[in-house]
UniProtKB/Swiss-Prot annotation:
Biological process according to GO: isopentenyl diphosphate biosynthetic process, mevalonate pathway
Species classification: Archaea, Methanobacteriati, Thermoplasmatota, Thermoplasmata, Thermoplasmatales
Catalysed transformations (reactions): (R)-mevalonate + ATP = (R)-3-phosphomevalonate + ADP + H(+)
Pfam families: M3K_C, MVD-like_N
Enzyme Commission designation: 2.7.1.185
Keyword annotations: ATP-binding, Isoprene biosynthesis, Kinase, Nucleotide-binding, Transferase
Residue ranges that the Swiss-Prot or TrEMBL entry lists as coiled coil: none
Enzymatic class: transferase
Protein name: Mevalonate-3-kinase
Length: 324
């Protein structure tokens, strides 16, 4: 039965307008508009690879570890919705099941998005893309609230208000060809995303955060129309500052002393060449430079983090093989 399978590859993500606050733990619709990019390594070696296959018993493996099918954000919540129709396409009855095996490669942050998008691409390809992508995105958000960033690739904006959510592409990856993202990683535990979502909404200025995100999204659309890549990443840096100040105010600190030291070095380097930085919810500082300045930036950052990767903006998911 495992002969019926599809394998896909999708790319993790980095926030540009950062997400904080979701409707509930089941549906995970963002409470405000956000934006982000998909990324991979400069040698295309950063991705999630997922196989969806027909099996006797339903199983879900992530990086070789079997996960509880009833756990929060379990892929089975999405698979079960489409199981009957998928099995019908290969003339199998509901006594059969669908399982997934998903593996992450060299990902610093954003693997939930790429995992959800890779599963989504598996399902879409079986239906030959004859599926309502807007409602389907909402299904996949039950796994990862910002999955749209990986579903479309490039730069995207997600318009949301806690009840409805819609992602639209703004720029293709090629628009970023003259820029490199340096991923500076620190070997510390990351905060669970739910800790961020549950606490940031307690901030006294959270309503203003919602308005600020809307204003930034409009600005991002304008910057994208003009292909102003520096402006896009400068907006991202300003949003990082606002976001992490709010998190600090409610007792959730993502940026530790070592990360702060690296950020200070990034600011110093601005005197010599253009750069910008982003910190999302994990133990990473993403530093963006023009390609011509990468060596200078690397020289200044190498001794301040535990690992460093060269990254680039990535595209949408890909089907690697299919037998359905």
């Amino acid at each position: 039965m495992e002969n019926y399978n599809v394998k896909t590859r999708a790319f993790p993500t980095i926030g540009i307008i950062l997400l904080g606050g979701i409707s509930d733990k089941k549906n995970r619709i963002p409470l405000h508009t956000t934006a982000g990019i998909a990324y991979t390594g400069i040698n295309n070696d950063v991705y999630t690879e997922t196989k969806l296959y027909v099996s006797k018993d339903e199983k879900c493996y992530i990086d070789g570890k079997e996960i509880d099918l009833n756990s929060d954000r379990s892929p089975s919540k999405v698979i079960d919705k489409f199981k009957h129709e998928i099995l019908m396409r290969v003339n199998l009855d509901d006594e059969n099941n669908l399982s997934i095996d998903s593996r992450n490669f060299n990902i610093l942050s954003g693997s939930s998005d790429s995992g959800a998008a890779a599963l989504g691409e598996c399902i879409e390809s079986i239906f030959e893309y004859n599926i309502n992508i807007f409602t389907f995105e909402n299904d996949l958000q039950r796994i990862s609230e910002s999955v749209g960033r990986s579903l479309y690739g490039g730069l995207t904006v997600n318009y949301a208000n806690g009840r409805e959510s819609l992602t639209e592409p703004l720029l293709e990856p090629e628009a970023f060809n003259n820029f490199t993202i340096i991923g500076a990683h620190f070997n510390i535990d990351r905060k669970p995303s739910n800790e961020i979502h549950e606490n940031i909404i307690k901030h006294e200025n959270y309503r203003e955060r919602i308005k600020s995100a809307e204003r930034k999204a409009k600005k991002l659309e304008e910057l994208s129309r003009n292909a102003n890549i520096k402006g896009i990443f400068e907006l991202a840096e300003s949003d990082t500052v606002e976001y992490h100040k709010m998190l600090h105010d409610v007792g959730v600190d993502i940026i530790n002393d070592r990360m702060e030291n690296l950020i200070e070095r990034v600011k110093e380097m601005k005197n010599n060449f253009w750069n910008s930085y982003i910190v999302t919810g994990g133990p990473n500082v993403f530093v963006i430079t023009e390609k011509k300045d990468v060596d200078k930036a690397m020289e200044g950052l190498n001794d301040l983090c535990d690992d460093i990767r060269l990254l680039k903006v990535a595209g949408k998911p890909q089907v690697i093989s299919k037998n359905f």
